[in-house]
Amino acid sequence: MGAAASRRRALRSEAMSSVAAKVRAARAFGEYLSQSHPENRNGADHLLADAYSGHEGSPEMQPAPHNKRRLSLVSNGRYEGSISDEAVSGKTATEGPQPRVYTISREPALLPGSEAEAIELAVVKGRRQRERHPHHHSQPLRASPGSSREDISRPCQSWAGSRQGSKECPGCAKLVPGPSPRAFGLEQPPLPEASGRHKKLERMYSVDGVSDDVPIRTWFPKENPFSFQTATTTMQAISVFRGYAERKRRKRENDSASVIQRNFRKHLRMVGSRRVKAQTFAERRERSFSRSWSDPTPMKADTSHDSRDSSDLQSSHCTLDEACEDLDWDTEKGLEATACDTEGFLPPKVMLISSKVPKAEYIPTIIRRDDPSIIPILYDHEHATFEDILEEIEKKLNIYHKGAKIWKMLIFCQGGPGHLYLLKNKVATFAKVEKEEDMIHFWKRLSRLMSKVNPEPNVIHIMGCYILGNPNGEKLFQNLRTLMTPYKVTFESPLELSAQGKQMIETYFDFRLYRLWKSRQHSKLLDFDDVL
């Protein structure tokens, strides 16, 4: 990048020095004109303005938009350019001074000898004959070759005579008039090569860059197209690389920001500050009705018969069921109260442990030693059924104390936000506990094993997974509470690192042994038996 910038600065300074040399040459020649021609009083400022003299006064004498003048360059002995016509209708040669065309050459005779790169302006005075024609834009202008050569070569010869030892003026060369719709074409053969004492005019117009159709409007030197293109290409490549690097950096920042935001949202869900209000399945079904394609089409009830009879039958049936349930409830409550009225009775705490939990076989060894009311039950996750689990719970309760019911229960299994992985291919979600019959039957029978004499609601703790990490977890707990009515049961699933989690762990486990087991739960380097 530094090399390209220094190259551009060098090219710019060289262009400025070349322009300054041309300006000094033009001013020197203007002074020469002011001395040799008394009518030129303004020196260098009047040099290029004489071409428009006599045309500024009358608006009808303004040149047509297609008429252009050219400043031709003489470089390395080659003369390129043409004198365009200026179509002026009704203007004679005697009205006002004739326009002058100045050609830039490299002859140093008129300039000081110390100026190596001097540039002189050769004055070519021409008198053009124009034809008056109403359609001058479409008709070509015609002039005799002899008169054109005679008019142009006369001042050139007089000026060339005043120059000491200069080469022949390019305007005196052989002119080949080629009439065109727009201009006179002055085509000249190339002059012989200049002597070796003249350096080539650098950084002027490129031969390929100027065509005959496009006029040369300025003699300001242009930059070297090759080096300029190289610098431009380099800058473009640098800008493309910078844009690519900027996009990569912005993408990395966005990715890191999204990860931070996702972790923060997860943290907020875990601490419970963004707890979404629970929405039951019935409320969700009321808002949006959706049914499976295999469900039968709902039919409107036939209202031809009297519906009062059917409603009376249903109400009477519900009344009988409620009466039976109330009788059973009172009977079971009395039996449980009689069983628990003994001295030294401790309400049982049941631990239901899934074999899917890593190192679950060591969990019964880390429970509290000072609390005999804790009943651990380890079941096979792969082969056990809901009936097997319920029978094992009833058997353990009868062994502990006949007629005792569960006051507190811990379900230690795998799962995730919003679901419980109780058995193989049996995942408890808020929707499945309402649809699957075996799951509904399991939770209803489990509710009958809960205590009826407990003045506080019975508690079921969930460990091994964080159910409330998802709003569906709250929906699952709400549906389970609905299934287990009329028994008062609450579900809790606190984080283990929180204060509620520590209290839950201390209810069932020896806290020191539990932390030791937790640290070795996923380790294969040390057997837990050696630690115990």
From Swiss-Prot:
Motif annotated as Nuclear localization signal, chain positions: 247-252
Residues bearing a lipid moiety (N-myristoyl glycine): G2
Stretches the record annotates as Necessary and sufficient to elicit dendritic processes and synaptic contacts: 2-235
One Gene Ontology cellular component: postsynaptic density
Effect of F241E: Loss of CABP1 binding
UniProt keyword terms in alphabetical order: Cell membrane, Cell projection, Cytoplasm, Cytoskeleton, Lipoprotein, Membrane, Myristate, Nucleus, Phosphoprotein, Synapse, Synaptosome
GO MF annotations, alphabetized: calcium-dependent protein binding
InterPro entries referenced in this protein's UniProt entry, alphabetically: NSMF
Residue stretches in coiled coil: none
Residue ranges with Polar residues bias: 155-164
Chain segments carrying region Disordered: 34-67, 127-174, 275-315
Positions of modified residues (Phosphoserine): S206, S292, S294
Annotated tissue distribution: Expressed in the radiatum and pyramidale strata of the hippocampus (at protein level). Strongly expressed in the brain. Expressed in the sensory and motor cortex, hippocampus, olfactory bulb, thalamus and amygdala. In the olfactory bulb expressed in the granular cell layer, mitral cell layer and the glomerular layer. In the hippocampus highly expressed in the regions associated with neuronal cell types as CA1, CA2, CA3 and granule cells of the dentate gyrus. All isoforms have been detected in the molecular layers of the hippocampus.
Role: Couples NMDA-sensitive glutamate receptor signaling to the nucleus and triggers long-lasting changes in the cytoarchitecture of dendrites and spine synapse processes. Part of the cAMP response element-binding protein (CREB) shut-off signaling pathway. Stimulates outgrowth of olfactory axons and migration of gonadotropin-releasing hormone (GnRH) and luteinizing-hormone-releasing hormone (LHRH) neuronal cells.
Family indicated by similarity: Belongs to the NSMF family.
Name used for this protein in its record: NMDA receptor synaptonuclear signaling and neuronal migration factor
